[in-house]
Amino acid sequence: MLLALVGVTGVGKSYFKEKIVENFDFEKVNTIRTRAKRIGEEDGKSGIFMTKEELENLKLQGKIAYNFDVFGGTYAYLKDEIFSEKNMVFEMHYTTIEDWKKIRPDIKTIYILPNDIEIAKEKARKRNLSKEKELERIREIEEHYNRISTDENLRNMFDYIVYNNYDEKSEKEILMLVKEILDKKY
């Protein structure tokens, strides 16, 4: 199964990805990134960091399932992981939902909405970004949140929509949902 976690920056996608791997039989899809590493990020743990040229070589070798540009960098995913028979989990940008449904029609998507958008913005501010990038992310959070809140067609593209109140109850609800999805698979 391929499970995608979707939501605004700061909603907890990385946190929940770790919890899903910790609690269930899932492995993380390694997101390839051409952007510079942020403070605290490690190659192989926070994703795979490479140059655009290195990524281009993987594409020429036919090893990339999908790539897209966002936030001034290119993000890509390896075919071996995207088409694996194993349970795999990754973070997906909401604008790529239609592409992913074509690549893996059986993909399961969980859209995580923050109960309080200000908490998501605050978490984005704590990411050690340049002031310019921070402002770009805050604008993107607002734009993304407004779009998902008002666009019913967009919301309907996701299999599940859950709320994160950044508390234990929200965590339990999201993990229970993953368990239910897994139970349906078997």
Indicate residue ranges for each PLM-predicted region:
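ATP-dependent small-molecule kinase phosphotransfer cores
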Residues: 33-88, 94
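P-loop (Walker A) phosphate-binding loop of NTP-binding proteins
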Residues: 8
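Hydrophobic anchor at the beta1->P-loop junction of P-loop NTPases
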Residues: 5
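Post-Walker A helix-loop "phosphate-sensing" segment adjacent to the P-loop in P-loop NTPases
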Residues: 22-30
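Conserved phosphate-donor/acceptor-positioning beta-strand/loop module used by diverse small-molecule
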Residues: 89-93, 102-125
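Walker A/P-loop
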Residues: 13-14
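Small-molecule kinase domains that catalyze NTP-dependent phosphoryl transfer to phosphate-bearing small molecules
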Residues: 129-178
